[in-house]
Amino acid sequence: SVSYNKLGGIAEARNDYKAAEGYYAKALEISKRLAKKYPDDPNLQRDLSVSYNKLGGIAEARNDYKAAEGYYAKALEISKRLAKMFPEVPMLKDDLALSLFKCGTCSADGKLSSEQKAMLRSAAAIWGELYEQTGYELYAERRKIAQNRLNQCSE
């Protein structure tokens, strides 16, 4: 599934969303099969979440917000479960924050519901905690992006 995700990323970078969607769908199919066969393997569960997020990104780029929300919600469900099972793993907390951010910003008209704003606040808080724990600048940058998106909604 990793190879299909990489091919999808190349197609997406070329704005070839149809090809990207095809590759990501193949990655999702493989990830689903493996995650079902090995439900206790967190890496396979994470791969499944990544595939849902990638398909959500393609749907959002095509302005299919309903489909994007569905994919993002599935990724969020998996990310929540993994972060709860392995709270000591920063990467899984980051995945949770990314899923919260994607669900929190997916909007056809740019307006966010109170639930989406809460998701953005949660994502920013998680990234803030990760930055404090690790000192990794990427987490500080992501926290700032989430906070800026919240501030845009308040204006």
Each language-model region and where it sits:
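A detector of tandem-repeat and repeat-rich interaction/domain scaffolds
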Residues: 1-129, 133-134
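C-terminal non-catalytic interaction modules
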Residues: 125, 129-131, 135-155
